[in-house]
Amino acid sequence: MDENEYALIEALMERNEDMRVIAVGDDDQNIYGFRGSDSKFLRSFITDKNAVKYELVENYRSCRAVVSLANAFAETITERMKTSPIISMSDNDGEVKLIRHRTRNMETAVINDLLSSPDGGSSVCVLTSTNIEAACIAGFLNRSGRRAKLIQSNDGFDIYNLAEIRYFIKVLEAKLTSPIISDVLWNEAKDALESAYSRSSALPLCMTILDTYEKSAERKYKSDLDAFFHESKLEDFFSDENGTIFVSTIHKSKGREFDSVYMLLNNAAVNDDEARRKIYVGLTRAKNRLHIHYNNGIFDDFDTQGAEKITDENKYPFLDEMIVPLGHKDVFLGFFKDKKDLILRLRSGMKLLVTPYGMNIVTKNGQCEILRFSKSFKERLSGYSRQGYKPYK
């Protein structure tokens, strides 16, 4: 929690003497210091409010080998609230490999390791430190015919603004006569959505969003539905689809779990607790298999139960393709002002053509410009160009 959140809780406690406060958190996983989050506010409940601390040490997620390594690494964090080691409740020993390289270009090694491992039918994720590393690995996997999904934080993006969701709401509101949405109207709107957006690659995700709300609501209030759309995060609805390889930075993976995790740590810094906590978060995403590819000595002194140490002397080529996702900050929003009719005809999954200024779509009458890049994104593209990358057409 940050300073403002702590001040809010203090104000609530002052005005509600009988209110019980339960603060739950893991300070070893506090990796949002750059947003103002600080474990000192959690500790102050004990020092200033006479709170009692309980340590929840039973881990039902990860196998023994993963927990053993995580415990050993957590001991390198200097400022900690926890004093007891985590106990794995799994009967599975699992698999941990610490693979040290002599080269900076480890992306290909991670991909080769992933593709040669028996991960069939399980959830798989590649974790990196930087967005560019994640983009390169996702790009290579997709180009090689593997289904890869880049996990994005989608900061500032409201599910309510998805075209498919807006269409669903429009159908509901056209026939809604009370604050409560009837099952008949709900199903009619879902059928209309499936018909109108049958060619949209985002339709399965939107149906998952609607199904999630449907299962959680005994009665469907329009106001509750709107709040659900506004308050939910898009990444919360990404399912662990069989055969899909997720690629993410460690920060964006927080709160998620995967059967198999492959970590890429390129000259990973461990010179402060913030950096150590970030690596700890990455380690603890794994349930059964954890392979860490690194090229400095951060794991050399670890002797943990079930971890296999490997030295890879091979040299690997530099990956020559990356996926670059676009957000609101990357496009010139003013360009869309008079493009409503065109936008409503678009469907997720349609092929876009990259130009020096933005993107076009192919129509019966030729190409049509549908977006323009923002100034800051064009500067990013120039940076990629200087590194030898160019937009794929």
PLM regions: where:
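Core RecA-like ATPase module of SF1/SF2 helicases and allied nucleic-acid translocases
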Residues: 64, 123-278, 283-291, 296, ...
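Conserved RecA-like helicase ATPase core segment
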Residues: 3-94, 98
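Conserved interdomain hinge at the start of the Helicase C-terminal
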Residues: 102-121
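Amphipathic coiled-coil/heptad-repeat helices and related helical stalk/stem segments
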Residues: 5, 38, 106-110, 246, ...
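Conserved active-site motif detector
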Residues: 300-393
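Short, acidic/turn-prone active-site loops that include or flank metal/cofactor-
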Residues: 17, 27, 152-157, 268, ...
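Amphipathic alpha-helical segments in well-structured domains
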Residues: 38-42, 275-279, 374
